[in-house]
Amino acid sequence: LKAIEADHPELVTPDSPTQLVGGAPQASFNTIRHPTQMMSLDNAFNQTDIERFEASIRRSLAYQGDLEYLAELKIDGLSINLFYENGTLLWAATRGNGQEGEDVTFNLLGISGIPKTIKSAPATLEVRGEVYLSKAEFERINLEREELGEPLFRNPRNAAAGTLRQLDAKIVAKRKLQAYFYGVGSWRSLSEKTQAGLLEWLDAHGFRVNPLREVVKNADEVEALMERWRKERPKLEYDADGAVLKVNSLPLHEELGSTSRAPRWAIAYKFPAEEAATTLKAITWQVGR
């Protein structure tokens, strides 16, 4: 479908599956509308994809000078949006379909790295982040569920999503959700002019920010960084499925704009799927009718 729409842009409609983000909110939670749309990201899988991404940016800007990108390790978790008014946290919501999400404020209040108040904050501020469970906590939860005869979570991301959407606050409190923050709904109310500076601002104001980030200048530097992060990946305390590459200049974000579902100034560079060996120990034959 993406290929057809690329060849025939006149066929693209707002309700096309390629233009939608995430899924509909669950009925068991109140729905909150995001003041600024929470977008998805287009994907890259190799250096050629990154070179095409950079070429697309240069065409859009008609620019041949140096460009900087901020590469941020991409945690495999659940996207959230925090809304502050006059420096006070009013609500927290999941991404949902990008326009509306589920109100999960109460379930997030116990997570460290989410300040309830911010000093010297703009009148309104949206802060975007990723909620996740560590590998160790995921194993602990599944062991507990196995002992209780309950179905196991398939992976830490599913466990984090299930925990965040729990209606029983006692269960949420027992599971050690964590979060990292990586952006805002609009940067114009802040003085920072780079993505790197924005993350420093978030860190200085009490938001937990992933230290695994680095400024890079071209596809070769991106590939070298990705190779290093691939090697470090098994040692991480959480699941990571790649890196997010963003144009470092925030004013250029505005100039580049976005499609209906993804920004043109950022891309997710995915790690190859993890591989593991397994041993087939037995086969039980059954005859069907």
Q: Where is each model-derived feature located?
A:
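Phosphate/adenylate-binding "loop-and-lid" substructures adjacent to NTP/NAD/dNTP-binding pockets
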Residues: L1-K119, E139, N158, L164, ...
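A broad, low-specificity signal marking well-ordered, structured residues that form hydrophobic/aromatic
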Residues: M39, Y69, L90, L125-V127, ...
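Short solvent-exposed loop/turn micro-motifs enriched in small/polar/acidic residues
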Residues: Q64-D66, K74-D76, T124, W229, ...
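Short secondary-structure junction motifs
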Residues: Q64-E68, P122-T124, K174, R233, ...
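Flexible helix-coil linker/hinge segments at domain or subdomain boundaries
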Residues: G110-E126, D203, R208
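Long, charge-dense accessory insertions within large macromolecular proteins
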Residues: E130, K135-R289
